[in-house]
A protein has these predicted regions:
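Short coil-to-beta-strand transition motifs
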Residues: 1-5
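Conserved hydrophobic positions within beta-strands
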Residues: 7-9
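Long, highly charged, low-complexity intrinsically disordered interaction regions
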Residues: 11-76
Length: 76
């Protein structure tokens, strides 16, 4: 399981960030709060919630562990 991804921000918009880590670009869905924290930065550490089912695999990213835990409580 992935706890966080740390890397260079190659793309950023209010709903997602692309983090490049060792030559791999990870597409991570983010909240507006996380977007505001990342805006203007070139590097980031994003805490990950990995969502996977038969036809879909997504990474949700959060600026803090607390934000991720709240998300997990809401979907749980």
């Amino acid at each position: 399981m992935i706890d966080y991804i740390k890397g260079n921000i190659t793309e950023l918009n209010p709903t997602e960030v692309i983090l490049e880590c060792y030559g791999i670009g990870y597409r991570i869905l983010i909240s507006l709060q996380t977007y505001e924290g990342l805006n203007g930065k070139s590097d980031a550490k994003v805490y990950i919630h990995h969502y996977m089912r038969e036809d879909e695999e997504l990474y949700y990213g959060f600026a803090t562990k607390d934000e991720r835990e709240l998300f997990r409580l809401l979907i749980g």
